[in-house]
């Protein structure tokens, strides 16, 4: 760049910063403009790895969708528990009016510190969400679910009235406001969504999600969760075999997937994943039905090995750290990197 252009650019940047504030515009390579983001674990080690950054990104819009009883709310409650363990403040916008606090506690959620709202209509739910995001004090907000964000006009109208596109317009307008505020506040907004069928589709999948197309565009991460089988103890079904596909990912390569077990009343079988992935990278030895770590045998069969790791959490954490270092290139399981200092200061201030 010649001197005249460089001077003109410098003057323009100075004018922009004077008018709109420091760090409004910067070079992408600057240390202060780092793109590394804080992450929150999903509760599933395999899914954290499939996401490519070690968890769900803060400051972004995230969508998780799937059929009924596939584990959507379970996954989000586990993410809330992980966020709280990092010292974060979380909120749950329960538009379906179906949150079970007893089950949430079983999954590790501190219900005393969890903010809960059960709004009357979609406008109220999204306005509450935006106000919480702009406060700068919330780390994670879950909206359960998009399908239950019923527009006020539909609630006040008659049962047979037609309200074409109302919910889609509501979501589009709300996301335009929330997305920028979420980035500035470093607050993750996680939408749970349901599946509907499109009529008359001859080719391709007839499935679609509710609430229009806006959420598909604004979401940095979209996950499709499905129940693919049952986990049995003898003849008794004790859980679901679950598969999650990362359909969209702006943080890492998309289309990866993870399979894991969700045990009823307990959540993801995290230690079973630690053993499987430990064997995959060579951190855990397997000879016949015996599993070993270093020179120590940890159990015969996966069930006994899980019990051993449950009784020896330090060994489980050590194996998990090795898995994350191998798969993600990081030894810290709580975050990939910190947000730059300027952004932290900005996130601490309420967004006007």
Curated annotation (Swiss-Prot):
The keyword Cytoplasm applies. SUPFAM superfamilies: P-loop containing nucleoside triphosphate hydrolases, RecA protein, C-terminal domain. Keywords: ATP-binding, Cytoplasm, DNA damage, DNA recombination, DNA repair, DNA-binding, Nucleotide-binding, SOS response. GO terms for molecular function: ATP binding; ATP hydrolysis activity; ATP-dependent DNA damage sensor activity; damaged DNA binding; single-stranded DNA binding. GO terms for cellular component: cytosol. One of its GO terms (biological process) is DNA recombination. Residues 330-352 are annotated as: Disordered. It comes from the Bacteria. It is found in: Cytoplasm. PANTHER family: MITOCHONDRIAL DNA REPAIR PROTEIN RECA HOMOLOG-RELATED (PTHR45900:SF1), RECA (PTHR45900). Belongs to the RecA family. Can catalyze the hydrolysis of ATP in the presence of single-stranded DNA, the ATP-dependent uptake of single-stranded DNA by duplex DNA, and the ATP-dependent hybridization of homologous single-stranded DNAs. It interacts with LexA causing its activation and leading to its autocatalytic cleavage. This is Protein RecA.
